Amino acid sequence: MNIDLQKLIDILNELKTASISSTSDTIEATMKKYDMLFVGSEFNTIYSVELHHSINNIFNLKITMDELNSLLPTACNILNMGFEKMIAVNDIGKPNAAISYQITLWK
């Protein structure tokens, strides 16, 4: 892992700023820039699976999904960003089910 909590906070803040600045006319360019979806009526929601991809490939920082998942709740709490744990329907009830997060960058 070459990403720490502060780097993740910086990335989430950058994505928040990009989201706030985006309009329906510019969101496609924003999504291309970060190679991830910004969803919701205000383009303020992202998913940790895509965030993981963007961190590794756009920001050129290496982190595993497990490492990202361990940092996300703390980073989101510090930034007052909403987050919800997600588990695939076919994994519900399984021990050690893979998780991901839906992150609301701003409200």
PLM feature spans:
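C-terminal engagement modules used by replication, chromatin/transcription, nuclear envelope/ESCRT
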Residues: 1, 78-107
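Positively charged, polyanion-binding regions of nucleic-acid-associated proteins
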Residues: 1-49, 53-58, 70-77
